Each structure stands twice: as structure tokens, then as C-alpha cells.
Amino acid sequence: MTNINRHNGKTRHAEIAGAGFAGLTAAIALRQRGWTVRLHEKGPELRAFGAGIYLWHNGLRVLEGLGILEDVLSGSHTPPTYETWMHNKSVSRETFNGLPWRIMTRQHLHDALARKAKTEGVEVLVNSEVIQAKTSGQITLANGEVREADLVVGADGVGSKVRDSIGFEQDRWISTDGLIRLIVPRKKKELGHGEWDNTIDMWNFWPRVQRILYSPCNDNDLYLGLMAPATDPNGSRVPIQLECWVEMFPFLEPVLIEAAKLQAARYDRYETTKLDVWTKGKVALVGDAAHAMCPAIAQGAGCAMVNSYSLAMELDEIANVQDALPAWEKRIRPDYRSLPSRFRRICREPVAFQRKHVRSEGARSSSLRSYEARVFLVMAATDIFESPS
């Protein structure tokens, strides 16, 4: 049987910009299919940015395909219930009818992917930034070095230099509001009585708008998402202003004290992108470079990993890279227009959306709408994702 990963007697080679979740997934999946892969990370080491992460069925299926699911499950957590609170009272409890999901620190997931990449023989270069790419398969590094490849993958984030150097047409939105994401000790004993193994989405609108997403990652680590309007100088301040948050969420004081100690905390605004195409010539964009998503949908990493994995699958079926890439995009690209406009609005005006839809219609219905948005993206991915044989 002909090995399509060899062309004119040579093994096909990929250069990948960016060693985040999308880049690592693409690197591992291609390497497992016989490619040689060089992965470029502009930083001095492989590390994850951010705090915690939710993975749903689609992302977990990718981890299974890569052979690291058990590694990731160890040291992560599935809450018994996803609760929604309104003014510090529980109004909704969802179990998602058995839909697989998991919470973990971003570093935990990134470490598992990085270990697998090295085990599979991916060549990883740190302090190596791709500053330019050409559709012919050529990349230029910050040190002036030029490299050639059968495939270039732009997994270099929202500010992708691979994407921008080629000139992909894009629409980009930055929201008026944002959030502070932190990992702190769980302090479960200090929190006292309560169901502190649950995810708890806490919404308050009076006397001011503040929200906390409480997400246990494992026995030791807690992921906190603290949301407030950018116009609120106290709620958006970093490091966090302890009194401001304890006043609204007094029962969380033990973990908020830990959060206030984190001097490197950031207030990040939501960013989303929409591109006309994800591929040109021998170049494919994945992850935030192609489809940065609103964190409220909790599908950015999962969809990035599915798209990266499916790219390798497509290239395993179609020998010609320039034929495989548009075929992959046609098959995998989510149709974001199918999402109701209310979900797209979350990304642009999160606080205004919350005020209108949660306070006026009830937190339970909003929780269900968020669930429906997640399930839409999960099913959009899993319908086209095939388990490796």
C-alpha cells in the first residue's frame, strides 16, 4: 500500500507556528501519521497562558485520539452539577444529561500535550518566532532564517503573524467588557458548609454588576472567573480589590483573599475573529488564529483541538496538500451563522447581554441557553469527528 505521507520518495514535513493547544494537537496528530514536524514557540519555554479550562465531549475525544486522555483525566475534575446562582441563591442545577465534560488548569492540559509531542518526536524550538509565511509553504523566523515545508500551520493566536503576513481577510471584535481569570487554592475546608465540588455560576446585578464563575479543577486548584464592566474601576481593577468582591460574595472570602495576592492578575477583554477562509495554498490556520471565540461559550480550546486533529486526518486521506486543505475547511468549518444572534452578542457586549437576558428572563433559562450554545458546538464537531481505528 502506498504511503501518502511520502511524496517523491520524501516524507512530508510541516512547520507549525505556535505551541498552544491547537499547535501541539496538530503537531502530535501529524507526527502520528508519519510527518516530520517542527514546532515553533516564540517564548523561552513551553507554557500555558491563562488559568482554567473546560473541555467538553469534542475536546475529550481528541485527547483520546492522541492517546493522552487518561493522563489528562488524572488531575482534573468533573463537577457533580453545574449550578447557577442569582443574588447568592441557587436557581438552576444542570447535569447535561451525562454529556462528558471536565475542568482542569490550562497548565495541566498543556503539560500533557507537550509531553506527548516530545514522546512522538516532534522537534520543538523555543525562542523561535515565525514572523512571516507564504502560501508556497515558506516561513521566515525572527532571526531571519527561512524554512520550507509541505505544510505551514498558523496556530499563533489572535495576533497571528502567519495569518496577517499572508493577508487573510478578517473581521475582529473586541468587547467593551472582560474578566479576570485566576487559579487559587481551593480552601474547601475554610469555605465551610456547601456543595463546593460543583461548578457555580454566580450572578449579581445589584447594587452593581459582578459575576464569579467558580470552577474546581482538582483537589487543590480552583479556577475563578471574575467578571465586571470595564467602566467599574473597582471591579475591573487588578490585582483585585478584595473589599469590592467580598462585599458581593462574602461566602467566598477565603479564596478571594488568595486571589487578591496575585500581582500578575489581568483584566482581559473578550476577543473574537471571523475569517472568510482558513486556508491558502499550503497554509492552514487553526485555533485563535482562525476562529477566536468568546470564553462564555467554553468551546475555544475544544474546537481548536478538533480542527487541528481533523486537519491531520484530512491530510492522511488526500495526498496533495493544496487539495486537502480546502476539503478540510469545507468539512470541518463550523457555520457560526447558525448560532442565534443572542450568542454572538455575548462576545461583543457581555454585561449588557447579562443584564437583559438573565435578570429579566431568569437565570435558569439563561443557563439553559448557554448549555444549548455549548451543545451546538459540541455536536457540530462530534458529528464530523471520527474515532481513530
Label the predicted regions.
Residues 15, 38, 123, 223-225:
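A structural signal for isolated positions on well-ordered beta-strands in alpha/beta enzyme cores
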